[in-house]
Amino acid sequence: MTRPLVPSLALLGTLSLAAPAGAQSAAALASADAAQMSIAAARQKSYPGSALTVRQTLAPGMNYRRFVVSYLSEGLRINALLTVPNGTPPKGGWPAIVFNHGYIPPQVYRTTERYVAYQDAFARAGFVTLKSDYRGHGGSQGEALGAYFAPGYTTDVLNAVSSLRRDGRVNGDRIGMWGHSMGGFLTLRAMVIDPRLKAGVIWAGVVGDYSTILNDWNNVPPASIPRRVLELRQKAVAKYGTPEANPTFWRGLSANSYLKDLGGPLQLHIGTADADVPLLFHERLASQMRAAGKPVQSYVYPGDNHDLTRNLGTALARSVAFFKARL
């Protein structure tokens, strides 16, 4: 039986050499290599996670408790927002959802801010939820190198999954993932790396393969992304060539190439007026899922934006119902 969450400051002493939030050292940037993003490489790594350590007890929700917790990912202390339903867990433990947030400037990110209403909807429905900061965000250790050309964030969410599986109140066979925008990219990757994940919901996800991301994603990057992080894309193309010149390499990095390995269905949501993520990403993934013989639900909201503001209640209700049916 896994120990319950216990407040501790021990890790603060052993892991005190953290880079400031959002920092990128020359050494970390130099060591980043797009080949580390291959699905095959990710499957060779271990993701042991750790016990969840309470850092702060927050005001409770309507029918659940809230905590800032931390867990370990490659020796880094990663903070996360955890919710736990009130009452006695069902036989085998509560179902759980790892909650993957979209891009927020790491230096302004706070564990307890953003996505509050989203996470609350799943928490009220009887799920344990865990929203990871990702490394280099807020008070979490490590360096924020982005999701697309460095593997750190993927590693962090997979260690979040393992940390939930270690917790005695969670049913390790009933864990799913929710992801928004960049978090949708992480969700799809995590699910093809770990087929024990039973279901995924992706809102406005960056879910194109690398050919699509490099060729068909023409939005202007946020000014808050450091130039040196943006240059990881140019570094990758300079070293490995374009997707047209080296298709085998880039297919190996794309979760879309491994959809047959998914351990459960996907539910996809997007608005047609999304100014950040092209509708094309959503449509192609839905088509690829059907071609792979995998179950997928696709919801397109006419005129809605990146956050599905006009249809928030509907999208949340559909997402909660999906997880209730699949976990």
Predicted regions mapped to residue ranges:
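N-terminal targeting or regulatory segments adjacent to alpha/beta-hydrolase or S9 domains
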Residues: 2-5, 11-64
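Alpha/beta-hydrolase fold nucleophile elbow
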Residues: 170-181
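Hydrolase active-site cap/lid region
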Residues: 189-243
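Short beta-strand/loop motif that positions the catalytic acidic residue
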Residues: 262, 268-270, 274
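N-terminal cap/lid segment of alpha/beta-hydrolase-fold proteins
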Residues: 46-91
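Short substrate-entry loop that stabilizes the transition state in hydrolases
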Residues: 89-94, 99-141, 209-210
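Alpha/beta-hydrolase active-site loop
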Residues: 148-168
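C-terminal catalytic histidine-bearing segment of alpha/beta-hydrolase fold enzymes
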Residues: 276, 283-327
